């Protein structure tokens, strides 16, 4: 136990940081303003010609320190004695400053650790979020058991502050942070779930940092437990970042003290001969080739870790251990399972002939048609049964703009789901978008679909819904009909996918 505590303390030991003074630096809020999360955050209401003002921040911090009582009435959420005018407006101002300042030491530490480990050299091969699927295809076919885990949340904000104090040594800064969270949260503590959800909407940047930090802390302890429980060395442990912001950080942060501080720590996995761990955002998958009782041991590790260290309630029945051949899991908008392909091989030895049955495991990654139809129905492209409908909101646009919008959505979905082993569901989605586009154009011209197509001859350019993928492939591969036909049937993982599609929702 003493060795474990020494390990964690050594891992968290960092030099003294002086972050408190940065809260009062004007360029910190200039960075937040230029980040364009919300252009109206740091705007004076009158007299400053739409320029952000450091005077607002200093005035609010002074009022926070002068506040005598921190408990504010729950019935006074829009206007109270502490904030004075608008809670959301002032909360966003200070939380943006906190989020930018607190990211600085973590990213500088990350930059040095990546350079020491020389991870940057081979990072380019793993910069897409879809790079996880070749890993699944390569490794999961040899495994037997899988556990689909949702990382429990929310966690109390005070616990996050206490954990942050282990990593960053700056007492005045965390005193101010605790004071801010206590004052902000005091008028909605009667409904805890509403408190966290409201905080995440009003302060998305700061909330994402706290959430990602919580997940990183949990995974660092998880890796430590794995090392203590196994005599085998950890074969690999890598942390990947969504490419959309990574290179901007590498090129500008160290030189310019940061142009962009987004903390998109989202994709991690580690593997060893016994256990495989994959995580994207708040969902992780644990798979193993060994007996299920070893998986059960890890399940109880997780439960006790969340309950005892983070005070997040989680029950064992929420984590199920299933045979991989009988269970499908959802990740990044795909349904994945292991399919058993059985074949009979005739073997002849001298005068004897034997029939040998061979079972080959193959991972099956398909498009989840029902969730996609629900997403399209929510976006008003079809009804809940998948029947295409018109989009009258776009009827004021020109014909070219309407067609271009539908084509972009169709191309993005086709690009995202090109790795599916079954294309029938994808063709149905493209058909829904194609017919919805035609109905929208017919609605704009106050005509029926049949009359509109007959009058305008729109069949030709609407065929792009089914031909744009072949045109892209023809630019990459030789213009051989058999080659393109084979590629259109096979799985293709495009490693330029930076983030999940807007119509993709992981449940």
From Swiss-Prot:
GO molecular function, one term: RNA binding
Localization per record: Plastid, Chloroplast
Alphabetical GO biological process terms: mRNA processing; RNA splicing; tRNA processing
Keyword tRNA processing in record: yes
Residue ranges of coiled coil: none
Domain of life (superkingdom): Eukaryota
UniProt cross-references to PANTHER family, sorted A to Z: MATURASE K
Protein's name in the database: Maturase K
Organism: Lens culinaris (Lentil)
């Amino acid at each position: 136990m003493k060795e474990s505590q020494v390990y964690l303390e050594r891992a968290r030991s960092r030099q003294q940081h002086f972050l408190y003074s940065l809260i009062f630096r004007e360029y910190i809020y200039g960075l937040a303003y230029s980040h364009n999360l919300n252009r109206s955050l740091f705007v004076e209401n009158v007299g400053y010609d739409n320029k952000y003002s450091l005077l607002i921040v200093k005035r609010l911090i002074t009022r926070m320190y002068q506040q005598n009582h921190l408990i504010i009435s729950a019935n006074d959420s829009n206007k109270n004695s502490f904030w004075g005018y608008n809670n959301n407006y002032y909360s966003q101002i200070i939380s943006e400053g906190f989020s930018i300042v607190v990211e600085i030491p973590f990213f500088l530490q990350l930059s040095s650790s990546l350079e020491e480990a020389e991870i940057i050299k081979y990072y380019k091969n793993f910069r897409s979020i879809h790079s996880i699927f070749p890993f699944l295809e390569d490794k999961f076919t040899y495994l037997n058991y899988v556990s689909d885990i949702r990382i429990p949340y929310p966690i109390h904000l005070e616990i996050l502050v206490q954990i942050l104090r282990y990593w960053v040594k700056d007492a005045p800064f965390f005193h101010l942070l605790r004071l801010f969270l206590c004052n902000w949260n005091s008028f909605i503590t009667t409904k805890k779930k509403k408190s966290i959800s409201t905080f995440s909407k009003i302060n998305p940047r700061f909330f994402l940092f706290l959430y990602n930090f919580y997940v990183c802390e949990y995974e660092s302890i998880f890796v430590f437990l794995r090392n203590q429980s196994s005599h085998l060395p950890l074969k690999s442990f890598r942390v990947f970042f969504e490419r959309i912001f990574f290179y901007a950080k590498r090129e500008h942060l160290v030189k310019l003290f940061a142009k962009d501080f987004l903390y998109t720590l989202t994709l991690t996995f580690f593997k060893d001969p016994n256990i495989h761990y994959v995580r994207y955002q708040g969902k992780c998958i644990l798979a193993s080739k060994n007996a299920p009782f070893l998986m059960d041991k890890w399940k109880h590790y997780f439960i006790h870790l969340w309950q005892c260290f983070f005070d997040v309630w989680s029950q064992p029945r929420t984590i199920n251990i299933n045979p991989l051949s009988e269970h499908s899991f959802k990740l990044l908008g795909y349904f994945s399972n292991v399919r058993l392909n059985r074949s009979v091989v005739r073997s002849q030895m001298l005068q004897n002939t034997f029939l040998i049955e061979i079972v080959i495991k193959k991972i099956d990654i398909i498009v989840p048609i029902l969730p996609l139809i629900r997403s399209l129905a929510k976006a008003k492209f079809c009804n809940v049964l998948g029947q295409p409908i018109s989009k009258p909101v776009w009827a004021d646009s020109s014909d070219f703009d309407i067609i271009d919008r539908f084509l972009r959505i169709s191309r993005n979905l086709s690009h995202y789901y090109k790795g599916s082993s079954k294309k029938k569901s994808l063709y149905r989605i493209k058909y829904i978008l194609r017919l919805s586009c035609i109905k929208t154009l017919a609605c704009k011209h106050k005509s029926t679909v049949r009359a509109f197509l007959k009058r305008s001859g729109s069949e030709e350019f609407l065929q792009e819904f089914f031909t744009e993928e072949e045109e892209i492939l023809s630019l990459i591969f030789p213009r051989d009909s058999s080659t393109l036909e084979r590629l259109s049937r096979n799985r293709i993982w495009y490693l330029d996918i930076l983030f999940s599609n807007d119509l993709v929702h992981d449940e």
